[in-house]
Amino acid sequence: MKKLIFLLILTISCNNNIEIKPQVIAYYAGDEKSINEFDLEGVDQIIYSFLHLKGNKLAIDDKKDSLTLLNVINQKKKYPKLKVLVSLGGWGGCETCSDIFSSKKARIEFAISTADIIESFNADGIDLDWEYPGISGYPGHSYKLEDRENFTDLIIQLRKYMKKDHILSFAAGASYRFFENSIEWDKVMPLVDNVNLMTYDFYGSGSTKTGHHTALSSNEFQDRSAESSIEALMNLGVKPSQIFIGGAFYIKTFKNVANINNGLHQNAEWNRSYNQINFEDVRSNFNFYWDDVANSPYAYDSINKIFATFDDHKSIKLKSKYALDKKLGGIMFWQLMNDKKQNGLLKTMVNTIKP
């Protein structure tokens, strides 16, 4: 086993020494036809979201999802440089992951089934979105201390059974709890291509105060940010070129927010989320502001006492520039269906990463 791990690390390490150009990664959770409506020029990867476990194996849920995946992969004909990955899990989509992946036999069966799906669909790899190994995630989903080591072996098995040129990545929670308890970074990172750092959802349905849910920088009221998360990963020895900063193409809102400091860092109750399109229906109710310290936009509806937190063109541009300045692997975002078809946030992202 030690020899196998060494050979796998050596192979991937050689690949990691190649000069990496910053990339744009898009998660896609849409239907079969909508993907055709987006301009994907400049997008390096689309991660089709999501596939799930069926017993010990990776499985596509139904025929509709198969057709959608096929059409996403067909985009490679129009965009020859595009890579398409499948993703396991997502929020609420990995209910049995902890239990299934506790078995060596199951991890091997999963890896074999993953390689089969990638080959049969002519996909380019897999992104693991297990939320979360070793710590609590979706309410009611099991987790155990051993998940951390089991995740490492899961990566080893995937590398063993996937082709060498297939991409292997995973989505990581942007919290110190995740960093410390979910991943054996020194063992996992030499075997994967990159980590997609979910630098969003810092505030959400469980929050009792408002804040920037996808802040680039920290401020005196909010420690969690993209910068602090990335610095923490680097301190754990993760190479900048393997880290992708995350952008959020959706808006989170909170209600019953007092008209103090334009609603920022105030007591609140969760309201709802919007995408870039349906937020236009209520946009006129809001006044828009910018936090110079957190490098983040926010908005406040003083009539209805609603606070909104999001990424906009300015913050996406700053995140993209940060990725360039820090020589990160690039920037990723959740998700394409939340964007506008014309002059959306993706266009700003691509134009900044690839001027």
Say what each PLM segment does.
Residues 137, 142-151, 164-166, 291-293, ...:
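Short acidic, glycine/proline-enriched helix-loop-strand junctions
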Residues 3-13:
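Sec-dependent N-terminal signal peptides
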Residues 88, 247-322, 348-355:
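Glycan-binding loop/region signatures in secreted carbohydrate-active enzymes
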Residues 28-42, 104-120, 176-187, 230, ...:
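Short, acidic/polar
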Residues 46, 86, 128, 158, ...:
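Conserved, mostly hydrophobic/aromatic
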Residues 25, 54-67, 112, 133-281:
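Substrate-binding surface in catalytic domains of secreted glycosidases
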Residues 18-118:
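Glycan-recognition patch characteristic of GH18 chitinases/ENGases
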Residues 20-22, 42-44, 80-84, 122-126, ...:
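Short, well-ordered coil/turn segments that N-cap beta-strands
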